[in-house]
Amino acid sequence: EVKLVESGGGLVQPGGSLRLSCATSGFTFSDFYMEWVRQPPGKRLEWIAASRNKANDYTTEYSASVKGRFIVSRDTSQSILYLQMNALRAEDTAIYYCARDYYDYPHWYFDVWGAGTTVTVSS
């Protein structure tokens, strides 16, 4: 069974940092692109970061809203995806999800999602 389990959310003051984790199991972690997506209260889902697969050297990509503040990385030995979040702002308050990318030519799908972890940025 393929599973994604996020953790690490919580309450943090503006300007603070958090590191989210996404523990994965049931598939070959290195073969897949992995994504971070968030949903602020009352708003739509927003893609924020990607970690490409081993074949693409685990290169990364970020949305403009988090670039320079957030860093996505992997522990390939433990099959964990991370999101280091720095210089947090009130507008970063959201439920954060990790998702697996699946390629079925000619389309990409986020085919497996975790349950999410909540981040609240407030003083």
Swiss-Prot record:
PROSITE patterns: IG_LIKE (PS50835)
Gene3D superfamilies named in the record: Immunoglobulins (2.60.40.10)
Domain of life: Eukaryota
GO BP, one annotated term: immunoglobulin mediated immune response
The keyword DNA-binding is annotated on this UniProt entry: no
GO molecular function: antigen binding
GO CC annotations, alphabetized: extracellular region; immunoglobulin complex
A Pfam family that the UniProt record links to this protein: V-set
Record's keyword terms, sorted: Adaptive immunity, Hybridoma, Immunity, Immunoglobulin
Domain Ig-like, chain residue ranges per copy: 1-114
Additional observations: This chain was isolated from a myeloma protein that binds phosphorylcholine.
Listed name of the protein: Ig heavy chain V region HPCM6
